[in-house]
């Protein structure tokens, strides 16, 4: 009897690649990482870890037609605790992976960076920063 086991990283990566299957999401992340956006990677990190804590940043987000109150710092800490720094980090630290991109190109990133930006995009953190920066 042979069983196929999948690691947590493989499961997370599969889920992340499905999320980033829409090129616009990956492009949005890359613009920030490559310095082509009005906000920088450091600003996104600083907002999530410092500003949101000090100013208790809260706003409404819509999920499944319901409006929910989103507490940026509280949710950030919950994700960090659930995933650990290796799997939830805005910077390209730890083990790098190569993922396919458009026009037969690829990009190097980490699972942690992809996961952090998924959180930031899904919960309108990036949009909030852009609107208020």
Language model regions located:
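Long, highly charged low-complexity segments enriched in Glu/Asp and Lys/Arg with interspersed Ser/Thr
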Residues: 122-133
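Long, compositionally biased non-globular segments that serve regulatory/targeting/scaffolding roles
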Residues: 1-88, 99, 111
